[in-house]
Curated annotation (Swiss-Prot):
GO biological process: cellular detoxification; coenzyme A catabolic process; nucleoside diphosphate metabolic process
Protein family according to the UniProt entry: Belongs to the Nudix hydrolase family. PCD1 subfamily.
Protein name: Probable nudix hydrolase C6G9.05
Motif (Nudix box): 153-175
Keywords: Hydrolase, Magnesium, Manganese, Metal-binding
Annotated EC: 3.6.1.-
Superkingdom of source: Eukaryota
Keyword Cell cycle belongs to the record: no
Enzyme class: hydrolase
Function per UniProt: Probably mediates the hydrolysis of some nucleoside diphosphate derivatives.
Amino acid sequence: MKLKLRWKGHQRFLTRQNSLVGFIWSPLKNTFSKRNSILNNQVCFEAIKYIQRHYFSSQSHHVTYLHQSPLEKLVSNGVVNENGDLTMDSLSHQIYLLHKNRPTLPLKPTNQPTRFASVLMPLVNTSQGASLLLTQRSPNLRSHAGQMCFPGGRVEPSDGSHYYAALRETYEEIGFLPNFFTYLTTFPPLFTRDEKTEIRAYLAFSVQTSLPSLGTGEVKDLFYVPLTSFLNPKHQKISRFRNTDLLYVEFNIDKIPRIWGITAVILNMYLNSICPDALISIPKF
């Protein structure tokens, strides 16, 4: 029987104990450690080689891939283990895939941005398997009211780096401490419609096993969305990005507000890299 939590009228799933909880995060190394052994999760070559040695041949893999369920696609790509959870090996392989299939955006700014923003894409293990944490903005905000997004915000001069700005904003918005996260990779920058703001997205993993708290009035609600939900074709819809020629897939998932705009474009880049052909008719970013 699954343990569920009713919160703000929505169904929430408590995060469960997972295979990474036994490891601790080393701030100096920015990676996992257990006892006296430091495990480099950024470039875990041994794990990558192991996964590659046990892969199916590319041709037979592609034939069966088209008929697989979302979970089977994630497993066959080494993104999660057979139970649908994130492990050290699967996280290392995600980094490998995101660098191998690094997305590029066809839209380039014509002007230099004058403002900078950063968002964090928190990967966590929940009772529904590997999931991403997204927030819903307050309906009282002047911009992007009520929209779904990743935690983040404007880069301040005191932040020191774009990544730290994403960590700071995440803590202020939902209560996740910076040392809860292990950095995985960075995505190509995106730009607002007026090209004045550059947005950088950072993928990070957290072993946090309890629900965070909403720290400011900017966030109305938060959602743990399983990766399998994003890969379900029934939840996908082609959309056009802000009066441009850029097509992308937005997500309409049961009991979760519509995910569209820049947040959906970031998700497209991520999912298209770790599970090629898993989204419907998306452009090649």
